[in-house]
Regions:
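RNase H-like, Mg2+-dependent phosphodiesterase core
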Residues: 2-183
């Protein structure tokens, strides 16, 4: 589709090249599911969905159902954003979004969909949405969690161990976690 001329645009935004950015947050954390966020910088519109923690627990984890669910979530988010015909779709290079990239290319056309490193507001808003999700569980994340990933993991683990019923909020499918989840 040809880009409209300035004279044919009803708003400045209509003539501006728009971009959708898709990011994830929480994949490497022990608690909750994973947030998939979508952000359009030109309008500052942000939306997200959560891939439930059940996808990171057996038996779904072994089947890698989280990859298919991430693709479904990404497709729903893009569709609800009503992208223009030539609007670029940038997707985080995270492994969890690999299937999403392929599905988006099939649905919206390969040249429009690019795998990139997501930074800035898209990343910040997706991370903030994830932090809100874990706070809803009653967990208070450490302030410097990004800089101190190992400390953050063990802080989450101690929180789970204080109350065995919290285990239902943990991503127990990761093989390396099994050695830490013992009660």
């Amino acid at each position: 589709m040809a880009r409209p001329t300035k004279a044919s645009c009803s708003t400045d935004l209509e003539c501006e090249e728009l971009t959708l950015q898709i990011d994830d947050a929480g994949v490497g954390d022990l608690l909750s599911g994973v947030v998939i966020g979508i952000y359009r910088p030109e309008t500052e519109r942000f939306d997200f969905e959560v891939i439930g923690v059940r996808y990171f627990q057996e038996p779904r984890f072994r089947q890698k159902a989280y990859l298919h669910e991430a693709a479904n979530v990404a497709l729903r988010l893009v569709k609800s954003s009503a992208p223009g015909e030539a609007e670029a779709i940038e997707v985080c290079s995270s492994f969890i979004l690999a299937e999403a990239v392929e599905q988006l290319k099939k649905t919206y056309g390969g040249p429009r969909v690019k795998t990139v490193k997501i930074v800035g507001k898209a990343q910040d808003k997706t991370e903030a949405a994830y932090l809100d999700e874990i706070r809803k569980l009653g967990y208070d994340p450490i302030p410097d969690r990004d800089a101190r990933r190992a400390r953050s993991f063990f802080h989450m683990l101690r929180w789970v161990r204080k109350d065995r019923s919290r285990l239902r909020h943990a991503k127990t499918g990761w093989p390396r976690l099994r050695r830490y989840i013992m009660f």
